[in-house]
């Protein structure tokens, strides 16, 4: 493999043994592609805005004299960029403008004669735009729209599993689910009659539906039944014989063949042999006794030819009397329905008998009554309602997916078709459910991923946009019908508010629009790849059963079987598997390699769950030779959801990668194959809660996917084009682009501005640091700057800690963790948290609030950190209770005493009419002010601080743009200089020419002269562009802010808090091994090894066996080896060994392992590159052990041997307090530990006095409300059991809801009198009132 310059800085040794056939696709593509389809122009009109507009327009007036037509749309440019929107707290959105055409028809002339046409562009609201990282900025906060897994439109057949009826009989049902419109259900009742329901309302016999579709009784019988024909003889009947129909019957007469010989005697069962004999003898008719027809059902009406009387009506049972009547009337042939209890039930015939309707109108009226009970039906109303239910394109749409699923399920040829239902569709569904009831077909599995599809951002936004358009449509239609249309323009007809409201509601408050989890890069990526079954049109967690939540065989390679929440949402919220994608229909697909005749090809096909069922698929870890031929005789494979063994030649596909089945979070766990699934789930979930540490530390033992996640998440800065680093500082990187990658006539400079110390959604710190130096060569995709939780482009949200598994004085009881003081001193787990505190000055009824340093009754010391505007300085260190922004609020006028009046008369208006409402630092918070933002309403005078901040921003913007301009200008001059040198100018000559004159020189060569003129043009463009950009920036900075109504000014203060690790903080490994720090031990007391190196963290060995997460032990051993190799390299460097020796050792390390595919050609590295690599490996060689394809035990031992460590992975440790050797050897190594976002500082809380609940008068609960600790029922039992009567009394009275008692108690404590007088608890009064509300008079008898 060829490594770029930046990749050579640190190479991760990979133990993967399977070749990489397919790279993991871009992780955020599910979000970006979906939204792109929504916003991109689509000429076909099948999706996005185009589809929504075409479905609603043209809008015709009721009279038909005018219509509003859609022409085209365009999305404008957003006013502010993403960062500005976040700072200002506004939505990152672009205006949508639509060109509409209003057509007026001439009433007097021929129909369709156009009288007037008006075209105009109309504003239709702002549409939120997606950022490059797949998020939306809504009201200044980053949000993610989670994709939804919902039931695909189409037709589904199911049964009730025998739960509906007491007999336990299985009742089948069919449901046609459209994308939009009414649901249509068919179901059997316990008596085997077929019923229909519309939108889950009252059920009606299914034949009513057919009658409403204009089928007569005769048509219905013809549709659903075969016929048996009888010829009437004198004293017998001759039946047309279809031998197959006799199978399984007991003969009620002798069955003879055409020769008259008896094949089946009366009373014998007809077997398959008898049927073969009948077919062989070519018998077509069979004589049967007359009573055989009794009870059979007539297939049509039989009418007396003379009188016209109906002798036997269709669907009536035939009796012997009926037969005699028919015979007398001269009818020679009778047709009956073929009904057989085994495989041809009389369901439709029974349904017709319970149907009271006889014609179409009656059926329509019955449906109208069911849909609109209480309304009097008219013919037109009934017709209109039924027509609109399933046959109107405005009200009903199966969608492309629904039609495809419908046609495939009912084996109708093509996948295309109309979005509405036809008569034939409804009949086909009824026929199919009857076939299922007859045992001829299977019901569907609704948890199969072929029946559930993904609805992503774009689709949901389009649906919501369409909802807004439909609201507008009604209003437009009304306006077209009223008023003088000659005066109106399209703009006057359209009100954009309903559209904006619908879109805003979706992005702002939909269940699937979620506040982005921004703890670390992994949590961002996972949140964007989340698939939820909840949300509008989805499931609810209360109703979701076990089957929906369970892992289904079709999840393989599509949804991760490991990563899901642990609580009530388990199984309802899933994560996309690493290689999965959605197809054009919205179904999940996963890639497979094609196998032909036992040979694996390089062809890769993406298969959906439906397609996968047709193939035999082998796993990725099967043995193949170098030509791709399968080596095993019997290969483990999957077919139709079952695991089995088959011959190599029968295999049709194989997996592309062992990590195919798991999500990105699960594939970050090394040695995942050795962990129990439950613990792996916890490990995957807890990695998302890891807080970025102050100094990121790459994991020594990784899986090789760390770089992919870091790059795809967008937190690192990646080179867009190749070149070399021209300039680097903490906030900017400038790359001089390679000549080969230049676009014609550009300066060839790429500038990357870095994000510095900004706040994430979870209050963690986002900061980017350059990881390149001036002069470094760069290729496309190189990481130029690390973001939060990344180290040289690798994801790094924890620290490599030296671990020992041993008990230590009970301090690791029940998963507690003992850590060394050194860890805290070295700031290994120190994190920075940035809080945003806001102070809002409003316009109140009594006057305006004011932000000022002139605050009543506040001492000088409290104001020491404020400037003259009353706003805290940047850099000030503040603690709980300090004033950040001084604010005074007008008080209501109070009655003044004569003395006060006198004082006011003497001293004028005093500050007594305002109260202090300043913004203070919350209790228990201590930190540094890192930024202040002031937003002032338009028209309100800016204070001094706001002006200063503005000037600072303008100066910064000017500095940035000037530097950018200088760099670009230098690029232009540099190219001009080269051009002039090539044209024959001398270097000395060029040095004498002033820079500004370089571009106006004349050259004899015409082509070069043209090129120089182009450069001069480009320079002028750059200058104009600089002026324009600066003007835009200046205008943005100086313009007033659009604040909420009644708000005059907002001051936002950003407070950075440094949190070191401390007892009570939660930590975890990557294998679900979590615990809480119990003690921070002095370094000298920690166990140490024979070299005197102390242990950093002591974990409990009892936490491993029962949890079955053995992966952590292998990680510790491999970590020890990786660090040991780093120590060996460090020793070599310190001893200044020969570079050849160091090169040899590094080469040996990278070549270690069986069948390892990675090839690092260390010999091709220059000496400098080897030296830099060695320096970067001093802390340990990073290792990749991919999930299900990782390092084996033998390889770990080889690594330990190479690091000159005991291959057992255990060593002798000594007690730091006594110096004595511990009894037995201890497992010591390096584990990657994470600090989770469950910090004791955020949870620790104590209450003195505070607010109380209004009804019960008990203290509130929780830190946010400054609440008390709950003393619950079980705690009361505990005190009762101890007999602690006085403690119990004070708990239930003065410390809780005895209002008078607690007030008195407070006074007593203040006075130094420690006594209490308990009274009546308020909750007793609540109980009394509740009993009285039940109508029971209860009175308290107080003695």
Curated annotation (Swiss-Prot):
It holds the Pfam family RNA_pol_Rpb2_2. GO terms for biological process: DNA-templated transcription. Keywords: DNA-directed RNA polymerase, Nucleotidyltransferase, Transcription, Transferase. Transmembrane segments: none annotated. PROSITE patterns: RNA_POL_BETA (PS01166). It comes from the Bacteria. Its EC number is 2.7.7.6. One of its GO terms (cellular component) is DNA-directed RNA polymerase complex. The keyword Transferase applies. It catalyses: RNA(n) + a ribonucleoside 5'-triphosphate = RNA(n+1) + diphosphate. DNA-dependent RNA polymerase catalyzes the transcription of DNA into RNA using the four ribonucleoside triphosphates as substrates. Belongs to the RNA polymerase beta chain family. NCBIfam families: PRK00405.1, rpoB. The RNAP catalytic core consists of 2 alpha, 1 beta, 1 beta' and 1 omega subunit. When a sigma factor is associated with the core the holoenzyme is formed, which can initiate transcription. This is DNA-directed RNA polymerase subunit beta. It comes from Shewanella violacea.
């Amino acid at each position: 493999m060829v490594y770029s310059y930046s990749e050579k800085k640190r190479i991760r040794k990979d133990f993967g043994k399977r070749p990489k056939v397919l790279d993991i696709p871009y992780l955020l593509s599910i979000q970006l592609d979906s939204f792109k389809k929504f916003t991109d122009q689509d000429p076909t009109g099948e999706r996005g805005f185009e589809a929504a507009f075409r479905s609603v327009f043209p809008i015709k007036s009721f009279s038909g004299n005018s219509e509003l037509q859609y022409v085209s749309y365009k999305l404008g440019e957003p006013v502010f960029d993403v960062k500005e929107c976040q700072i200002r707290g506004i939505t990152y959105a672009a205006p949508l403008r639509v060109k509409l055409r209003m057509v007026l028809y001439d009433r007097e002339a021929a129909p369709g004669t156009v009288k007037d046409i008006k075209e105009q562009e109309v504003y239709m609201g702002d549409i939120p735009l997606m950022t490059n990282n797949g998020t939306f900025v809504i009201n200044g906060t980053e949000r993610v729209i989670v994709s939804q897994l919902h039931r695909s439109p189409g037709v589904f057949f199911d049964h009730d599993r025998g739960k509906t009826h007491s007999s336990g009989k299985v009742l089948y049902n069919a449901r046609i689910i459209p994308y939009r419109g009414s649901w249509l259900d068919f179901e059997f009742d316990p008596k085997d009659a077929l019923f229909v329901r519309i939108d889950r309302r009252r059920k009606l016999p299914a034949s009513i539906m057919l009658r409403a579709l204009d089928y007569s009784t005769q048509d219905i019988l013809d549709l659903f039944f075969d016929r048996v024909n009888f010829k009437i003889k004198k004293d017998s009947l001759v039946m047309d014989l279809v031998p197959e129909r006799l199978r399984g019957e007991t003969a009620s007469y002798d069955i003879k063949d055409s020769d008259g010989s008896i094949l089946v005697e009366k009373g014998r069962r007809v077997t398959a042999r008898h049927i073969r004999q009948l077919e062989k003898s070519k018998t077509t008719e069979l004589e049967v006794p007359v009573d055989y027809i009794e009870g059979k059902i007539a297939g049509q009406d039989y009418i007396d030819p003379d009188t016209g009387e109906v002798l036997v009506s269709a669907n009536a049972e035939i009796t012997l009397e009926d037969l005699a009547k028919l015979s007398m009337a001269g009818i020679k042939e009778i047709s009956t329905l073929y009904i057989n209890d085994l495989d041809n039930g009389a369901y439709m015939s029974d349904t017709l008998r319970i149907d009271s309707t006889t014609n179409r109108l009656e059926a329509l009226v019955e449906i109208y009554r069911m849909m609109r009970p209480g309304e009097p039906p008219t013919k037109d109303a009934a017709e209109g309602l039924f027509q609109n239910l399933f046959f109107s394109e405005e009200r009903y749409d199966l969608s492309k997916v629904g039609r495809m699923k419908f046609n495939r399920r009912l084996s109708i040829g093509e996948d295309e078709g109309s979005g509405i239902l036809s008569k034939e569709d409804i009949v086909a569904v009824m026929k199919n459910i009857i076939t299922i009831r007859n045992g001829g077909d299977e019901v569907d599995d609704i948890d199969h991923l072929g029946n559930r599809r993904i609805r992503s951002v774009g689709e949901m936004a389009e649906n919501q946009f369409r909802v807004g358009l439909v609201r507008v449509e009604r209003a437009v239609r009304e306006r077209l019908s009223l008023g003088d249309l000659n005066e109106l323009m399209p703009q006057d007809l359209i009100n954009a508010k309903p559209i904006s409201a619908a879109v805003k509601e979706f992005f702002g408050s939909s269940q699937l629009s979620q506040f982005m989890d921004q703890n670390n890069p992994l949590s961002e990526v996972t949140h964007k790849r989340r698939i939820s079954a909840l949300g509008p049109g989805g499931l609810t967690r209360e109703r979701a059963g076990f089957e929906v939540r369970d892992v289904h065989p079709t999840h393989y390679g599509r949804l991760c079987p490991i990563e899901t929440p642990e609580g009530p949402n388990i199984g309802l919220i899933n994560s996309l598997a690493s290689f999965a994608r959605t197809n054009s229909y919205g179904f999940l697909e996963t890639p497979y390699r094609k196998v032909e005749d036992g040979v694996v090809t390089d062809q890769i096909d993406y298969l959906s769950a439906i397609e996968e069922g047709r193939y035999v698929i082998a796993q990725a870890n099967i043995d193949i030779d170098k030509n791709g031929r399968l080596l095993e005789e019997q290969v483990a494979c999957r077919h139709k959801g079952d695991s089995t063994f088959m011959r190599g030649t029968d295999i049709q596909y194989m997996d592309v990668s062992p990590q195919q089945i798991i999500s990105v979070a699960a594939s970050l766990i090394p040695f995942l194959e050795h962990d129990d699934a439950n613990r792996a789930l916890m490990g995957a979930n807890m990695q998302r809660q890891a807080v970025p540490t102050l100094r990121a530390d790459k994991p020594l033992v990784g899986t090789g996917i760390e770089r992919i996640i870091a790059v795809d998440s967008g937190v690192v800065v990646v080179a867009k084009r190749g070149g070399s680093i021209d300039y680097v500082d903490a906030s900017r990187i400038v790359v001089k682009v390679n000549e080969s990658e230049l676009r014609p006539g550009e300066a060839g400079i790429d500038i990357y501005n870095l994000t510095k110390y900004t706040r994430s959604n979870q209050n963690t710190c986002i900061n980017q640091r350059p990881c390149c130096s001036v002069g470094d060569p760069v290729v496309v995709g190189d990481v130029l700057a690390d973001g939060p939780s990344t180290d040289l482009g690798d994801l790094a949200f924890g620290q490599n800690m030296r671990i020992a598994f041993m008990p230590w004085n009970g301090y690791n009881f029940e998963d507690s963790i003992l850590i060394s003081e050194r860890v805290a001193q070295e700031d290994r787990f120190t994190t920075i948290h940035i809080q945003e505190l806001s102070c809002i000055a409003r316009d109140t009824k009594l006057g305006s609030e004011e932000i000022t340093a002139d605050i009543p009754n506040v001492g000088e010391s409290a104001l020491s950190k404020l400037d003259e505007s009353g706003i805290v300085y940047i850099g000030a260190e503040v603690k709980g209770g300090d004033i950040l922004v001084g604010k005074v609020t007008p008080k209501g006028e109070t009655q003044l005493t004569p003395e006060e009046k006198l004082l006011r008369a003497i001293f004028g208006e005093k500050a007594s009419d305002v109260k202090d409402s300043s913004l203070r630092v919350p209790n228990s918070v201590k930190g540094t002010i890192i930024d202040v933002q002031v937003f002032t309403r338009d028209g309100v005078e800016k204070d001094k601080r706001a002006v200063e901040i503005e000037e600072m921003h303008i100066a910064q913007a000017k500095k940035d743009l000037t530097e950018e301009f200088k760099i670009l200008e230098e690029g232009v001059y540099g190219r001009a200089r080269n051009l002039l040198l090539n044209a024959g100018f001398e270097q000395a000559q060029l040095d004498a020419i002033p820079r500004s004159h370089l571009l106006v020189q004349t050259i004899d060569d015409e082509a070069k002269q043209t090129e120089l003129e182009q450069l001069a043009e480009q320079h002028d463009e750059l200058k104009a562009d600089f002026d324009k950009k600066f003007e835009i920036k200046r205008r943005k900075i100086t313009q007033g802010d659009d604040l909420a109504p009644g708000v005059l000014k907002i001051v936002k203060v950003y407070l950075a808090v440094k949190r070191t690790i401390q007892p009570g903080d939660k930590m975890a490994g990557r294998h679900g091994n979590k615990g809480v720090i119990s003690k921070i031990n002095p370094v000298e007391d920690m166990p140490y090894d024979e070299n005197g190196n102390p242990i950093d963290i002591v974990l409990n060995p009892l936490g491993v066996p029962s949890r079955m997460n053995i992966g952590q032990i292998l990680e510790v051993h491999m970590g020890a080896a990786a660090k040991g190799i780093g120590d060996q390299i460090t020793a070599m460097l310190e001893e200044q060994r020969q570079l050849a020796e160091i090169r040899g050792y590094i080469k040996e390390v990278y070549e270690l392992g069986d069948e390892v595919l990675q090839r690092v050609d260390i010999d091709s590295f220059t000496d400098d590159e080897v030296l830099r690599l060695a320096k970067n490996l001093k802390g340990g060689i990073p290792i990749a052990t991919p999930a299900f394809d990782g390092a084996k035990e033998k390889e770990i031992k080889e690594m330990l041997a190479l690091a000159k460590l005991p291959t057992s992975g255990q060593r002798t440790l000594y007690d730091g307090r006594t110096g004595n050797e511990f009894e037995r050897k201890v497992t010591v190594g390096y584990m990657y530990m994470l600090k989770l976002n469950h910090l004791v500082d955020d949870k620790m809380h104590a209450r003195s006095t505070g607010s109380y609940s209004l009804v019960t008068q008990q203290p509130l609960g929780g830190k946010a409300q400054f609440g008390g600790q709950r003393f619950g029922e079980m705690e009361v039992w505990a005190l009762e059991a101890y007999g602690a009567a006085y403690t119990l009394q004070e708990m239930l009275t003065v410390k809780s809801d005895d209002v008078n008692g607690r007030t008195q108690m407070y006074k007593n404590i203040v006075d130094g009198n420690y006594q209490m007088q308990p009274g009546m608890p308020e909750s007793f009064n609540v109980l009394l009132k509740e009993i009285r509300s039940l109508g029971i008079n209860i009175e308290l008898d107080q003695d």
